[in-house]
Amino acid sequence: MFSLQEICRKNIYFLPDWLSEHVIQRLGLYWEKHGSLQRIGDDYVLIQQDLIIPINEALRMAGEEGNDEVVQLLLLWEGNIHYAIIGALEGDHYSLIRKLYDQIKDCHNILPLIQDPKTFEKCHELDESCNISCLVLHAVKNDMLCILQEYKMRLSGGDIQEVFETACRSQKYDIVTWMGENIAIYNPGVVFDIAFDLMNVSLLSIGYTLLFNHHINNMNENIDSLLAQHLEWAAGMGLLHFMLETLKYGGDVTITVLSEAVKYDHRKVLDYFLRRKNLYQEDLEELLLLAIRADCSKKTLNLLLSYLNYSINNIRKKILQCVKEYETTIIIKILWKRKINLIGPILADFIGYHSYTYMVDFMREFSIHPEKMIKMAARESREDLIIKFSKNVYKEPKDRLHYLKSLVYTMRHKEGKQLLIYTIHNLYKACHLESKEMFNLARFYARHNAVIQFKSICHDLSKLNINIKNLLLECLRIAIKKNYPQLIRTIKTDMSYE
């Protein structure tokens, strides 16, 4: 429970001028050798009605003086206890240190606030469970190189490796450089791994400096393969500045390297090096095929095509194979706009296994007439697509029937034509045709040698007690003229019953 005095001390923001020094002291708002203390907002204090300083700076000063009473007042005003501990460490007031430290039990959050190496060490010693390795790790994180220099001989090989990696990840360039130049590190090459992980070209540059200027161990055995690997990594990540930094020390941007840029669609990397390298036609073609397989953007595909002058004769079949295998149409659209039409060859493959929704989008994207889609669906035995595309053209079954009949006349594919006729007959079954329309449909079947459908519609007409003798005679003439033996036999059989 707070006393009334503490509540007043915590919340008072204004001291009347008429208050005497004695009253201020009795209120606990007096700082010996400094004067009265007054809270200004949440972050500042006013000393002796004259000097305004941050509350945490006042805490550090009070801690350095060992003034527990002022420290407690400032903590009441929501100052940061860490600054009080720092001040107490600077003034070697260990009883105050212990009193304050017991409230937090962890020194590591204080360390980033400390600038002085000696105070840094003393603060870390407050945690009796920590060792030298822990001290050095935190020193590295907080740019205390001098502490690392002091304790380097007391670190094991594993500790040194951990400290080096910490310096790299914390991007403490001076410490990374000093360690690379002065301490034997088990795996110094980790600097490159971390540089790529953080995408930090400064670390990469330091790694190369250590490798080439100081010949640090374990890194100079196969420099060519190391540089090649770095170029591939950088190309795959789109890090052009990494590639340029690496090339200062050697290496070459090969097709393997450019393939990584293509695979991950890094057009700027590609553009930069394609402008500066004279690649063979075959290499450019391979990069284009890889870009298709990787589903690269239009800009990347256009870039590669531009270096091929949009000439794809040598790889036409391979492009179609890639489009089919990876179900991508971007390249087809780009070439189509350049008057290079690959739609026909790929349409049959796509319509053979893709859904109606997909094919509708494909049709709209490339402005394909529904008639072509229906005929191709018939060739590929996709009755479901025939029904859906024709329904999209005409909603009414009768209209669809007449529309499909018109397509049969121009359909050359035998099995496709048969499927269209089969679909037409199913539509007929769902319609209510007048006898005249049924006669016309029977003649249509006769013209196209659709024996089964012809027999079916004649049977339907007979059930309606409609005389079909003249129809059979007319259709017989058609069958004889077109030389349809099976249809001739069927008609003659039907005529025998009339």
UniProtKB/Swiss-Prot annotation:
Q: What induces it?
A: Expressed in the early phase of the viral replicative cycle.
Q: Give the protein family.
A: Belongs to the asfivirus MGF 505 family.
- What role is this protein assigned? Plays a role in virus cell tropism, and may be required for efficient virus replication in macrophages.
Organism listed in the record: African swine fever virus (isolate Tick/South Africa/Pretoriuskop Pr4/1996) (ASFV)
InterPro entries attached here? MGF_505
Name-wise, this protein is: Protein MGF 505-5R
UniProt keyword annotations, A-Z: Early protein
